[in-house]
């Protein structure tokens, strides 16, 4: 009887990650792209560990998984996993804490400048042969000296603050779980009252998990208090912004624009109003999709599994359940 640990890789990870485990003497590895509940339930019942990308892992997939000890998430969000059931079964959840912070921060920079400088409109104007109409085009927005609010101050938030201070912006941070001193050490200013803070912000970028407390946190009541020149960017989780409320606020010119990388439902339904709103820059949950980042994430996802069974996984990578 083999003493090897059985590992299920749910959805492909970068080949550099697979190289760490495919020929490892302590593991038998199986890959699956079938993310149906029936398949995952069947596959997991004999597994000791698994990795997961964005597929859902509801509690019923853990039924019968008597040996399952670790699920390594390819990313930092974990709202696709039934945490309550994982806790009941003493299954640890690990995240790729170090892989994507810089990449997502760069994406936010790109999206902000794209929206502020009306990149798509200006590009289309030239391509359509309307260069001569340049003086009729709407003006753009500078980011210099503007107020930038980071909502959530984990690794991505810390990567952001370095970059936006380089733009000479005034950086504020909303995170009830981070001490004021930690924020000020990096050049930011902590805000305690979110409802009051958003009234004076020019840019708001979301980097917090989706929880009962953060779901629909950005809603019409909050949006209507923002500056008409405000740009809001979400590269965290879709449910944090109420999508219909955002569409309404944009149509009423309550804010300048939005950058959306994540949706409440992925892929979004065809009738999602944001898909037809030209004031929104959209991307398909690809803020971390650089080759460099995907390599790091693939390697860290697999290394977390190996480190767990070798009892050397960093505690900071394990989700508190």
Task: Please place each PLM-identified region on the residue numbering.
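Phosphate-binding beta-alpha-beta segment of Rossmann-like dinucleotide-binding domains, i.e.
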Residues: 89-91, 97-147, 159-162
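Glycine-rich Rossmann-fold phosphate-binding loop(s) that bind the pyrophosphate
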Residues: 153-154
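Short, Asp-centered acidic motifs that coordinate Mg2+ and/or phosphate
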Residues: 48-49, 70, 203, 231, ...
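Adenosine-phosphate binding glycine-rich loop
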Residues: 268-269, 277-298
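NAD(P)-dependent dehydrogenase/reductase Rossmann-like domain
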Residues: 296-321
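An N-terminal-biased, well-structured beta-alpha scaffold segment characteristic
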Residues: 1-94, 199, 219
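NAD(P)-binding Rossmann-fold cofactor-contacting core
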Residues: 166-184
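Rossmann-like adenosine-cofactor binding region
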Residues: 56-62, 178-273
């Amino acid at each position: 009887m083999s003493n090897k640990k059985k590992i299920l890789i749910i959805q492909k990870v970068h080949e550099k990650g697979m190289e760490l485990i495919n020929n490892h003497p302590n593991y038998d590895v199986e890959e699956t792209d079938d993310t149906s509940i029936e398949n995952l339930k069947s596959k997991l019942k004999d597994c000791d560990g698994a990795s997961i990308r964005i597929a859902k892992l509801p509690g019923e997939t853990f039924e019968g998984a008597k040996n399952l000890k670790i699920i390594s998430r390819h990313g930092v969000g974990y709202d696709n996993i039934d945490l309550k059931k994982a806790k009941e079964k003493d299954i640890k959840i690990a995240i790729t804490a170090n892989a994507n912070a810089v990449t997502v921060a760069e994406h936010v920079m790109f999206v902000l400048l794209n929206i502020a400088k009306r990149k798509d409109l200006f590009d289309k104007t030239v391509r359509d042969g309307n260069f001569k109409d340049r003086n009729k085009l709407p003006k753009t927005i500078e980011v210099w000296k503007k107020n930038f609010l980071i909502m959530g101050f984990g690794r991505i938030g810390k990567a952001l603050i370095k970059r936006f201070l380089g733009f000479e912006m005034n950086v504020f941070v909303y995170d009830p779980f981070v001490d004021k001193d930690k924020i000020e050490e990096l050049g930011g200013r902590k805000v305690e009252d979110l409802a009051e803070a958003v009234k004076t912000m020019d840019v708001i970028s979301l980097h917090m998990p989706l929880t009962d407390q953060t779901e629909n946190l950005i809603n019409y009541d909050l949006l209507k208090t923002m500056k008409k020149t405000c740009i809001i960017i979400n590269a965290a989780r879709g449910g944090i912004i109420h999508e219909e409320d955002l569409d309404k606020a944009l149509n009423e010119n309550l804010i300048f624009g939005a950058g959306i990388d994540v949706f409440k439902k992925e892929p979004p339904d065809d009738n999602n109003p944001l898909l037809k709103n030209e004031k929104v820059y959209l991307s398909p949950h690809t803020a971390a999709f650089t080759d460099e980042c995907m390599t790091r994430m693939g390697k860290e996802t697999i290394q977390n599994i190996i480190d767990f069974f070798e009892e050397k996984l960093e505690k900071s990578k394990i989700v508190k359940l």
